[in-house]
């Protein structure tokens, strides 16, 4: 299946149903009064995270989602039926962005998590709601309000504990093949990896972590060189980054300069990502003698001003790989994920306390009082009234 990590969709919530103007017509009840019902609320549009999905490719073909409109009110005080909601399933790890405002509406990080992205319109009011002591036969009603409409940008960001960084041919895919059951393509030319891949590293029956491999970065990636930096977003949720450095580059380039390029591209992309814990891992030590590999690694670390611990491994022969994985496992255990509080969904507002409807009622009642003619009122504060009859 083709890997698609970005998609744009249109979501439209249902409009609210209109109120009804109706009067009770029944035998022996000549003045039955108003009995027009309210309309139904429009349906909402929801997103739901599904762990069984791993790509957004479905939304390259189906781009528009519309919830059902609320039914209009009917006579005999019948309220219109509420419009049906629409639920759109997305992979776990999807970020939802409103294209109109650029606002991030939410991150779908848990299976079954739901996020409302378009609220249905409010129902209109029937003429029964406008009955009062001065208006016994109201002919007023209100229309339902339109549902929300949004263009959404969906961005899939892989959920991994460890992210792999490095130049093309640094050995990232070989490392994942060595520590997990994932089998990304491996070859001796640059950009063998074209899409991100995940691997689960199982240390024992109870301990495991997920590692993400992304295509290699080159100088100028922030400006779009190579495969650009579009895949760096998949590392934003990682807790630690493994920066693989090829001790013996096939093109004869300087490993220290290559490392500086990677750090520079990280900083251009995101300061938050650049500030994540980053471990230096020198790969392909099997191509050099032990003394030569250690000396070269120390020289590179000194050139980078690196004062923390670094690792020397060979992903191809799995030399020192197990020790590195255990250190990663201990780091993950000591630094658990801090989940952000999920965005609270607005509670459903009941009719009597709805500001929109209350305002409409007040306006209609004010108009009715202004138009009221009290010539037939027995209680007259202004004196005697004469009524002429033919």
Curated annotation (Swiss-Prot):
Bias-annotated ranges (Polar residues): 129-143
Key words of the record: Cytoplasm, GTP-binding, Hydrolase, Magnesium, Metal-binding, Nucleotide-binding
InterPro entries on file: G_OBG, GTP-bd, GTP-bd_Obg/CgtA, GTP1-OBG_CS, GTP1_OBG_dom, GTP1_OBG_dom_sf, OBG_GTPase, P-loop_NTPase
Enzyme nomenclature, EC number: 3.6.5.-
Record's compositionally biased regions (Acidic residues): 364-384
UniProt-annotated location(s): Cytoplasm
GO terms classed as biological process: ribosome biogenesis
Region: Disordered, residue numbers: 127-146, 364-390
Amino acids binding GTP: 166-173, 191-195, 213-216, 283-286, 314-316
Cited Gene3D superfamilies: GTP1/OBG domain (2.70.210.12), P-loop containing nucleotide triphosphate hydrolases (3.40.50.300)
Classification via CDD domains: Obg (cd01898)
Domain OBG-type G: 160-333
Chief place of localization: cytoplasm
Record-linked Pfam families: GTP1_OBG, MMR_HSR1
Keyword field contains Metal-binding: yes
GO cellular component: cytoplasm
Amino acids binding Mg(2+): 173, 193
PANTHER family associated with the record: DEVELOPMENTALLY REGULATED GTP-BINDING PROTEIN-RELATED (PTHR11702), MITOCHONDRIAL RIBOSOME-ASSOCIATED GTPASE 2 (PTHR11702:SF31)
Oligomer status and interactors: Monomer.
Name listed for the protein in its UniProt record: GTPase Obg
Organism of origin: Cronobacter sakazakii (strain ATCC BAA-894) (Enterobacter sakazakii)
